[in-house]
Amino acid sequence: MAELVVGMCLMVLLVGLVIPKVDVGYAKAEWERRKLCSEIRYIKRRNLAGVNEDIRVTNSDKKSAYYIACRTNLLKKVEMPENIRMETLIDRIHFHTDGKPYKAGTVEINYKKKIYSITITPISGRILFKEGIYSSAK
């Protein structure tokens, strides 16, 4: 019984030393990229159905955020966690009723030196994100 208690104490000490040093920022950045990609695909489907919704990207000194709006009504506001930046030349992500984007380009989500990218293709309006060997995020 004493061996079991000593073994459990050692395990708790080891876990206590390892867990605080884990950087979850990369996982958060990946999660935000997947969430934003899903939101863009949702907006595209809504615009195909004739609903006039768009995503507006804003950057302040400390935080990045995006807003989902239908004409002038704000539907949703999503702020990026600390140290995660969103950079793009597209300030408004919006699609025609046939699926073509008004502006095509790339949205990048940065955490430290890793870059996660979402690309909106010009003519077809496909929403892609690069992973693995195809991505600049190594």
Outline where the language-model segments fall.
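N-terminal helix-rich module
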Residues: 17-37, 45, 49-54, 58-138
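N-terminal single-pass transmembrane signal-anchor helix
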Residues: 1-22
